[in-house]
Amino acid sequence: MSKRCAITGKGPMVGNNVSHANNKTKRRFLPNLRTIRVTLEDGTTRRIKVAASTLRTMKKQSN
C-alpha cells in the first residue's frame, strides 16, 4: 500500500528521532491519510487516500 496522497502526491518524509542524549536514529514522518469516496464524472464511486491537509483545503475551496 502506498502511503501517498492521491491528489497532492504528499508522501513520507525522512528525519531523525533525537533522544535527550542527542543520539539520532532514522525515522519516517508519515502523512495523515484518510480514505474518502469520490464520485467520478461517469457516476461511479471510488475510494482514494487523501491527506487530511488536502481534505481541509478542498473543504475551504468548496465554500
Swiss-Prot record:
Gene3D superfamilies: 2.20.150.30, Ribosomal protein L28/L24. The keyword Nucleotide-binding does not apply. Keywords: Ribonucleoprotein, Ribosomal protein. It comes from the Bacteria. Pfam families: Ribosomal_L28. Disulfide bonds: none annotated. One of its GO terms (molecular function) is structural constituent of ribosome. GO terms for cellular component: ribonucleoprotein complex; ribosome. One of its GO terms (biological process) is translation. InterPro entries: Bacterial_rp_bL28, Ribosomal_bL28, Ribosomal_bL28/bL31-like_sf, Ribosomal_bL28_bact-type, Ribosomal_bL28_sf. The keyword Ribonucleoprotein applies. Residues 1-20 are annotated as: Disordered. Belongs to the bacterial ribosomal protein bL28 family. NCBIfam families: L28. This is Large ribosomal subunit protein bL28.
